[in-house]
């Protein structure tokens, strides 16, 4: 029995042709032919069982046979906002794993001590799509490009909001304990993760003034991408249906 082939098509229900990159993979790598079955995902929670109707040099046409809406396996919306790492492969690693675990938004912060002040999201988007297909998750996280810390915390966000930091002079609560106390309450969750040098103390205070709760991620001192993944996994575990 052939393994199911999955393709990302944002407007799968209304389109009739795979996007160019997906078509090239379907035709050149998987060598799909007319009447072959494939599965599409729209990034908004649905799979589609489809049949290839035309397999040309650069075009792969299809016909939808069945729409299969999926129920999200976690409550609320989970957003992890982090300062991108100096080496982009570490940020890409986090984006891949967070997508596999299941989050709703990945945002990137330009902070005072950020090691990377510029970042491109085209490659990151491709990594996210690949992780969606690999993990069979039909939800594509919103990818929010690099935003100044001030602008991000100044924007109203619903639900529970946290900022992770390492300052002894600012009291913090444990992220896992706090989220566990709110388990199964269908709360949106936003967690801010700083750069390797941490947020500045003024940034932490600014976030607190905007309603963010200062939190600890445990006793270990974690790298940025590890801290971000820890936050994503913790939010997933306590919000799991």
Predicted regions and their residues:
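N-terminal positively charged helical leader segments and presequences
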Residues: 1-70
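Fold-independent oxyanion-binding glycine-rich loops
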Residues: 10-11, 20, 43, 83-84, ...
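Mobile, glycine- and charge-enriched loop segments
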Residues: 38, 63, 71-84, 179, ...
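RNA substrate-binding interface of SAM-dependent RNA methyltransferases
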Residues: 71-163
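Glycine- and other small-residue-rich loops at beta-strand/loop junctions that grip anionic moieties
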Residues: 83, 117, 196, 220, ...
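Active-site/ligand-binding-proximal alpha/beta "capping" segment
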Residues: 163-206, 212-217
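Structured adenosyl-cofactor binding patch, chiefly the S-adenosyl-L-methionine
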Residues: 201-241
